[in-house]
């Protein structure tokens, strides 16, 4: 990486502060062309990691802003290269003019995620940490941000490194046995190796098991609202969103198709799916809507079963209950608590663990519903940030787990060292893909292309 890159690192609309970022061997030379410090010293003589007041110049040397400049000499920088930032007033024209001046001084426009890619290639971050940068930028909830920053801090990386180092040490012993056939694995060594494989298998099983939670954390919990027509599903959707998203009328069967929206409830990101009321005998369009409701329930992790508290249970309610019972997590919301109660809530409490009263019309009980949702997906289960959050990570972890299980089984039944070694090598290769020690260049390019320009 012999060139120097530059980019605007802040959003492209007027704001209080805008930042120009650059990284590469010619950082100081580029700064001297566009920045004139008030203390008169060139960039290379400025104190590292200290803000310096000065003027930002355009390509002709005209002053365009009063700015602060901070320099991060290699290797103690984000990318591991010489880096700098120019903190300007957040005017798009100032930032664009400053960026053009940096290009005129020899910098190149940074590609998407190129600063983070350079950090990875220079060993400042491993691939898991680099991926967490994009997760942190895209975080919509405190849970998402917490998990991303834990991974950026190395929580997941340390878990993978511990597994990798244990397997590498064991593989080294097997190499010695394979290279020198007269050597043999003593019983004590065999037990130690089996223990290493057992711990590796347990750690990998925990990572793989956490993937489903990691995906829910990242993408949002698919949450389906189920109930008979006119139970108040759309009203509850609107109440949770805080605005009118779905059409609400007194006419049963108003909702014909699924309506989807994202909302953070109790710190949990939900992908709310309002569905057509569950009943038989509707027209062709309504029947199609009911089928889509059933399909949505199959994909959901949480069901909010909405019952009309002003009426007794009907066959249509029981049909909705049967469908809701197929979803892993279930909360029963007895709606219309502002009206006279006809539904036997005590009988419902005998059938379900989570039954609560709400009024979508007045907002009564929504706080209790929010708490119930948060209790289903508590932040405390985040395992300190050691959560796989994308399919690439899960695939590599699954392959590593399979190889470790094969190695453990082969060693237990006394297979020859070369067989066990082959499985260990497969596990190490998969773990190398997971943390970036062994990864294809095209995959690296794809991963970093998803990160925003300037990061």
Q: Positions of the model-derived regions?
A:
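Structural motif
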Residues: 89, 307-310, 336-337
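Short glycine-/small-residue-rich Rossmann-like dinucleotide-binding loops
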Residues: 241, 276-277, 301, 308, ...
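Inter-motif core of Ras-like GTPase G domains
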Residues: 286-310
């Amino acid at each position: 990486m012999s060139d120097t890159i530059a980019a605007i690192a802040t959003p492209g609309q007027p704001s209080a502060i805008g930042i120009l970022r650059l990284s590469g061997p010619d950082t100081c030379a580029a700064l001297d062309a566009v920045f004139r410090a008030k203390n008169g010293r060139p960039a290379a003589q400025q104190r590292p990691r200290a803000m310096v007041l000065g003027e930002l110049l355009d390509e002709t040397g005209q002053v365009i802003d009063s700015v602060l400049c901070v320099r991060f000499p290699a290797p103690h920088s984000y990318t591991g290269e010489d880096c700098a930032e120019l903190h300007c007033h957040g005017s798009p024209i100032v930032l664009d003019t400053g960026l053009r001046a940096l290009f005129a001084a020899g910098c190149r426009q940074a590609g998407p995620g190129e600063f983070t890619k350079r950090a990875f290639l220079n060993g400042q971050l491993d691939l898991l940490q680099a991926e967490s940068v994009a997760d942190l930028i895209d975080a919509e909830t405190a849970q998402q941000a917490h998990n991303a920053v834990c991974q950026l801090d190395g929580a997941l990386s340390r878990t993978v490194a511990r597994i990798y180092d244990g397997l590498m040490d064991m593989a080294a012993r097997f190499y010695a046995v394979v290279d020198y056939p007269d050597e043999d694995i003593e019983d004590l060594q065999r037990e130690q190796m089996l223990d290493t494989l057992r711990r590796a298998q347990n750690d990998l099983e925990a990572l793989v098991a956490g993937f489903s939670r990691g995906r829910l954390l990242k993408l949002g919990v698919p949450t389906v609202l189920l109930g008979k027509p006119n139970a108040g599903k759309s009203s509850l959707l609107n109440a949770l969103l805080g605005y009118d998203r779905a059409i609400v009328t007194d006419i049963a069967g108003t909702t014909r198709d699924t309506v989807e929206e994202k909302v953070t409830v109790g710190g949990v990101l939900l992908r709310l799916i309002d569905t057509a009321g569950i009943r038989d005998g509707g027209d062709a369009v309504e029947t199609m809507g009911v089928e889509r409701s059933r399909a949505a329930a199959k994909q959901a992790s949480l069901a909010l079963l909405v019952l009309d508290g002003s009426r007794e249970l009907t066959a249509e309610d029981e049909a909705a209950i049967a469908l809701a019972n197929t979803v892993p997590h279930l909360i029963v919301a007895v709606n219309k608590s502002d009206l006279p109660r006809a539904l036997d809530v005590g009988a419902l409490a005998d059938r379900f663990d989570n039954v609560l009263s709400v009024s979508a019309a007045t907002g009564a009980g929504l706080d209790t519903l929010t708490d119930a949702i948060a209790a289903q997906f508590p932040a405390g289960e985040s395992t300190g940030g050691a959560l796989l959050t994308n399919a690439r990570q899960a695939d590599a972890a699954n392959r590593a787990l399979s190889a470790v299980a094969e190695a453990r089984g082969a060693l237990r039944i006394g297979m020859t060292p070369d067989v066990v070694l082959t499985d260990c090598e497969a596990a190490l290769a998969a773990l190398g893909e997971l943390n970036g020690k062994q990864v294809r260049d095209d995959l690296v390019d794809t991963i970093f292309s998803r990160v925003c320009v300037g990061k």
